[in-house]
Amino acid sequence: MEGNARPEAQDTSNVPERFKMMAAVDMPQSGRKKFEWYTAVPPLCRDGTGLSPCDYFGREMVQNLPDQVTVGIINVAVAGCGIDLFDDDKAAGYLSTAADWLKNIARQYDNSPYKALVAAGKKAQESGVIKGILLHQGESNTGDQNWPNNVKKIYEKLLSDLGLNGAEVPLLIGEVVDSSVGGLADRKSVV
């Protein structure tokens, strides 16, 4: 979800002012500071990341909501990681065997993307209301039968840590191409 595609001119212009992003880390190249809101011009995750599913998801939301509604996102993501990196009970063990490049990304979140997400979520609640949680994971964990339970655990902990009600704050899961059309990373629909 961090975004790998290089943003083009059409991606960085005419971003609606009502579509905001909160930086979960300092982004000096972009002139963004941690826990501050900005118009959601990519990159939305960290400096050096690209266009992500969040970019156009948020723009579509804004276009389909009343003019007085602002949509804000917090993008905490680590490309190529398994879901265990977002489970605070497993993150340290996961990082102990991870590649150096992944460890370097995790360091930007103080080695806990989950805690970074909670901290940013609490800051966001000072000025807004969390209406949903987005999860988009690529091919990591494909075929892992425990993936749905791992996601459920993280989602329920996130709801608890942020004082949210699951009946009011859905988990929306993006998916790589599913198996019905030849995709090989299909497993999200079972959560």
What positions do the PLM features span?
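Cell-envelope and extracellular/periplasmic
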Residues: 1-191
